[in-house]
C-alpha cells in the first residue's frame, strides 16, 4: 500500500511538472510582481507614442511560466489608426537566428553533425579557404593568405568564422560580396540558397577563423546545412521539428494571405527624425517580403512571428528544451547553447554562446539582467531575453529602424526588473 501511494505521489508530481512547463495564460495575479511598479511601462510607452517617437509596440512578460503582461500599444498602422493587437505579426529578422540554431542542434542530437566538424565536409566549396590580406578599394582587387584552419559549425554559431554580411560589414568585404552578387540575407531574393552559399564558400574570409566576432551570413549558411543534411527545405524542417510540436501557429517564412492583415507596418525616420513608412528603396528591402512567396529561406533573418509564439520558443529553452510535454532538445544541449563559447567578450562586456548573447559576470554588474541571461534581437526593433535565475521570458516588439529614441527597450527592461519581488 505504501509503495502504491509513493507511486501515485511521483505520478502526480511528474504530471504537475509537465503541465507547469507551458505558459499559463489565465488572468492570475503573480505574487512575484509589484504591479504598481510594472504599470510604469504603460506610462513610459504612452509618452513615447504621444511624442511620436514610436508608432506601435507589443510587450510580453512571462514569470514562473505565468503570463504577467501581454499588451499592444499604439498602432499596427499609424496611417489607418488601426490599434496594435497583442497578436500582431512582426518581421523578427535576426531573431530567426536562434530558431535556426536550435534546428542545427536537433541534427547534432541525432548524430548527423559535430559542432567542430568542418563546413567543408558538407559543402566542398568551403574547403581550402583563404583569408583576406590586402584590399585595393580603387579596383576591388585583393590578395589572400591561406586560412590556418577550416571553419566549423561552431564557428558559424558563434559568428567567429570570418564570414561577413553583404551590406553591414567592413568596406572591403562589402565590396567583395557585392562583386560576387552575394545576397544580404534581408528581405526577398528570387535565388537558390544552396547556390548562393556555394558562391560564398569561394570568397575569402575577413579574418582567421576563431579570432574575432563578426556578425555575418553565418546563420544563412547554417540554414543551408540543415537543408543539405535533412534533405528538407529549412521551412519544412523548422515547421516539423519546432513550430508544430511547440504550437507556434503564427511563425512563417511565407505569411499566409489570411494572416497578412496582422502584419505591423515598418517605419524609419527622415533627416528631421520624423517617423515615415519604410520604402522598398531603403536597403533594397521590400517591406512586403513576408507575404512574397520565396524559396531562399534565410536562416538568419527570414521569419515573421508574434510575441507569444516567440515567448513559447524561449520558454522551451528556459524549461531545458521541453514545452507542454514536447521535448525539442535535451537539457544538456540547451546548457551548451547558453554557455560561453568564446575566449573574449564579443562586445566588450558580454559572453556569446551558440547563437545567443549571454550576460557575463562583468555585464551582470552593469545592468539588471542576471548572469546567464541569454538574448538577441532583430533589425527592425524586436528584442528578447530569458533570465534563468528570475525564471522569466520577456519580449519587446516594434518595427522601427533606425530609431533616434532607441532607448525604450532598455528603459522597459529596468522597469520590469524593478517590479520583481523575488
What are these regions (language model features)?
Residues 42-45, 65, 90-123, 127, ...:
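Active-site SXXK
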Residues 21-30, 180-184:
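Short, contiguous pre-domain boundary segments
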Residues 29-92, 112-114, 131-136, 288, ...:
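Short, conserved catalytic-motif segment at the N-terminal edge
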Residues 1-24:
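Bacterial Sec-dependent N-terminal signal peptides
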Residues 55-57, 68, 380-383, 392:
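Short loop/turn microsegments at loop-to-beta-strand junctions
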Residues 127-371:
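Short, surface-exposed loop or secondary-structure junction motifs
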Residues 384, 391-400:
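Short, well-ordered beta-strand elements
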Residues 53, 83-84, 114, 144-151, ...:
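Extracellular/periplasmic catalytic domains that process cell-envelope and extracellular macromolecules
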Amino acid at each position: 500500500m505504501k509503495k502504491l501511494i509513493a507511486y501515485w505521489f511521483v505520478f502526480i508530481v511528474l504530471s504537475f511538472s509537465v503541465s507547469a512547463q507551458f505558459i499559463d495564460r489565465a488572468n492570475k495575479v503573480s505574487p512575484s510582481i509589484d504591479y504598481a511598479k510594472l504599470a510604469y511601462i504603460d506610462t513610459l510607452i504612452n509618452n513615447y507614442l504621444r511624442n511620436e517617437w514610436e508608432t506601435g509596440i507589443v510587450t510580453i512578460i512571462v514569470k514562473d511560466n505565468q503570463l504577467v503582461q501581454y499588451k499592444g500599444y499604439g498602432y499596427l498602422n499609424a496611417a489607418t489608426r488601426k490599434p496594435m493587437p497583442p497578436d500582431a505579426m512582426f518581421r523578427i529578422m535576426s531573431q530567426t537566428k536562434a530558431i535556426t540554431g536550435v534546428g542545427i542542434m536537433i541534427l547534432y542530437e541525432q548524430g548527423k553533425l559535430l559542432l567542430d566538424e568542418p563546413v567543408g565536409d558538407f559543402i566542398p566549396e568551403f574547403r581550402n579557404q583563404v583569408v583576406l590580406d590586402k584590399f585595393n578599394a580603387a579596383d576591388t582587387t585583393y590578395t589572400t593568405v591561406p586560412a590556418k584552419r577550416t571553419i566549423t559549425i561552431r564557428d558559424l554559431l558563434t559568428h567567429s568564422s570570418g564570414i561577413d554580411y553583404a551590406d553591414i560589414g567592413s568596406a572591403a568585404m562589402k565590396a567583395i560580396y557585392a562583386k560576387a552578387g552575394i545576397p544580404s540575407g534581408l528581405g526577398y531574393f528570387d535565388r537558390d540558397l544552396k547556390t548562393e552559399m556555394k558562391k560564398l564558400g569561394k570568397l575569402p574570409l575577413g579574418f582567421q577563423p576563431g579570432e574575432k566576432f563578426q556578425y555575418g551570413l553565418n546563420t544563412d549558411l547554417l540554414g543551408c546545412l540543415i537543408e543539405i543534411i535533412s534533405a528538407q527545405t529549412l521551412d519544412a524542417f523548422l515547421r516539423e521539428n519546432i513550430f508544430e510540436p511547440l504550437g507556434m501557429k503564427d511563425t512563417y517564412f511565407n505569411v499566409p494571405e489570411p494572416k497578412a492583415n496582422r502584419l505591423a507596418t515598418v517605419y524609419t525616420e527622415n533627416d528631421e527624425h520624423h517617423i515615415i513608412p519604410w520604402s522598398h528603396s531603403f536597403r533594397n528591402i521590400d517591406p512586403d517580403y513576408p507575404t512574397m512567396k520565396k524559396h531562399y529561406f534565410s536562416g538568419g533573418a527570414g521569419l515573421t512571428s508574434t510575441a507569444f509564439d516567440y515567448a513559447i520558443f524561449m520558454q522551451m529553452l528556459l524549461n531545458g528544451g521541453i514545452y507542454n510535454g514536447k521535448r525539442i532538445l535535451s537539457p544538456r544541449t540547451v546548457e551548451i547553447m547558453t554557455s560561453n563559447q568564446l575566449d573574449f567578450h564579443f562586445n566588450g562586456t558580454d559572453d556569446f554562446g551558440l547563437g545567443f548573447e549571454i550576460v557575463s559576470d562583468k555585464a551582470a554588474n552593469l545592468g539588471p539582467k542576471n548572469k546567464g541571461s541569454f538574448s538577441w534581437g532583430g533589425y527592425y526593433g524586436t528584442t528578447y531575453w530569458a533570465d534563468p535565475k528570475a525564471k522569466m521570458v520577456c519580449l519587446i516588439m516594434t518595427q522601427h529602424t533606425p530609431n533616434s529614441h532607441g532607448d525604450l527597450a532598455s528603459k522597459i527592461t529596468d522597469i520590469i526588473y524593478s517590479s520583481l519581488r523575488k
